[in-house]
């Protein structure tokens, strides 16, 4: 009999939820992570008494009551509501696109006026079958909003002009004809008081954890420790990039402590012009309504990904989709290994969905 029932590769949200459920079911688990900390990309660290989101803003939101109840076992959530603003050459616009945005953009006051303005711009453009993101955006919100709030920002995010991006990406941007700045249309929303790391620590309570362990560098020896493996690393790396590397976008952060108590008045400010090199600035204290004398900001830069960089967003185009489908066949044929999470499934996952999937996989595994 092997020393552990499960070797869980990755101490992020998927790995932590699975480990928690497995331990609860009486299984012997070892969690390893190649980083020097748990919690994966939702890791928060205290700086000047402020919980800093090291890998970018993470705002928990869900419509799934069971998932909400699940996370509330491990943390108390505050009432933070995501209401980012856009800065376009010093003009400030509310996001998501709503009546506040339209009022600032055109001076319109009623939903009927805003709708008329957008319809007029859509008609002028005359796009019936959008072939790329630029056409899709203009066909949804007209030219003004596209030019000021989408074009530069999205181009920076993806490192290519909107004319070269697939139309479907823009579906992630909601449009509303109400004066409502709440970005997520979710029943439940907030940030765990004390940060995400403390929440994941609670999930992993009583589970053996080894950090700074590179699974793929010592795979055979680590595999020998456990009956089954739950792998949440990159699926292509697992197979030695045999079919080629899946593409990602990466993100780089410049974080600094400032000797002021309030730098920008909002947790998230998107810079939507093409000239500003960063995509947004995060002021971390506002996630937890902080009143500390100093503040910590992170400038976020979107970057091309190459092997060795931190993979953030899968590039969900046809080419990468087809390549992942081939890797998935290999993954499905791999005995005693469960592939899961953002990297293991090459998928953009919101946090609540990661938990949902991890719980459902754990239920099947542990039956």
What does each model-identified segment do?
Residues 4, 26, 207, 225-227, ...:
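Short, well-ordered alpha-helix to beta-strand connector turns
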Residues 4-31, 362, 366:
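N-terminal Rossmann-like FAD-binding beta1-loop-alpha1 element of flavoenzymes
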Residues 20-48:
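Glycine-rich FAD pyrophosphate-binding loop
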Residues 89-93, 99-228, 232, 239:
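Active-site/ligand-binding neighborhood in enzyme catalytic cores
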Residues 215-330:
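Mid-domain catalytic core of redox enzymes
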Residues 310-367:
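C-terminal catalytic lobe of FAD-dependent flavoproteins
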